[in-house]
C-alpha cells in the first residue's frame, strides 16, 4: 500500500495537472506535515512510485508484458533459452507466474525458481540495476 495516498488522491482529483512539475508540487504539499528529517526522502520515493505508476498505465506495460509472455514459447526453438529482466514487483510476479505455468504445461523444460539479482558491485557501478530481477526459462525439446 502506498503511504499517504488518500491525501494525494483528494488533491490530485481536485486539481488540474498538466505538467510533471505540478504533480510533484501536489505531492510535496500533501506530505508537508512530515518531519523535516524524513520529508525529502519520502517525497522523492513517493514521486518515483507515482511517476512509475503513471508510466506503467500510459504505456500499457502490463498488457504488453502479458502478451510477450504468451508469445514467448512460439519465438523459442526447442532447447532455446530466454532471460527476462523485470524492474518492479508487479512485472516480476507476472513473469514468475507465466514461467511456472509454462513449466507445468510442459512448454518449458526448466525455469528459474528463484530470482537472480545484480551483485553489490554491479549496483555500485549502475545504481539503476538495484531493482532489477532476472528470471529465465528453457523451451522444452
Show the residue positions of the predicted features.
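Conserved proline-anchored active-site loop of SAM-dependent methyltransferases
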Residues: 12-14, 86-87
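Single conserved hydrophobic/aromatic residue that forms the stacking wall/gate
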Residues: 1-12
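C-terminal catalytic and target-recognition region of SAM-dependent MTase-like enzymes
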Residues: 20-74, 78-141
Amino acid at each position: 500500500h502506498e503511504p499517504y495516498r488518500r491525501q494525494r488522491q483528494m488533491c490530485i482529483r481536485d486539481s488540474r495537472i498538466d505538467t510533471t512539475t505540478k504533480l510533484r508540487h501536489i505531492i510535496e504539499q500533501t506530505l508537508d506535515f512530515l518531519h523535516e528529517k524524513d520529508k525529502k526522502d519520502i517525497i522523492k520515493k513517493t514521486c518515483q512510485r507515482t511517476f512509475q505508476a503513471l508510466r506503467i498505465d500510459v504505456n500499457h506495460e502490463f498488457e504488453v508484458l502479458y502478451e510477450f509472455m504468451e508469445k514467448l514459447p512460439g519465438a523459442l526453438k526447442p532447447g532455446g533459452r530466454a532471460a527476462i529482466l523485470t524492474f518492479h514487483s508487479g512485472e516480476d510476479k507476472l513473469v514468475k507466474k507465466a514461467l511456472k505455468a509454462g513449466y507445468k504445461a510442459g512448454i518449458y523444460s526448466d525455469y528459474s525458481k528463484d530470482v537472480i539479482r545484480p551483485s553489490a558491485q554491479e549496483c555500485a557501478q549502475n545504481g539503476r540495476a538495484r531493482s532489477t530481477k532476472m528470471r529465465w526459462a528453457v523451451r522444452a525439446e
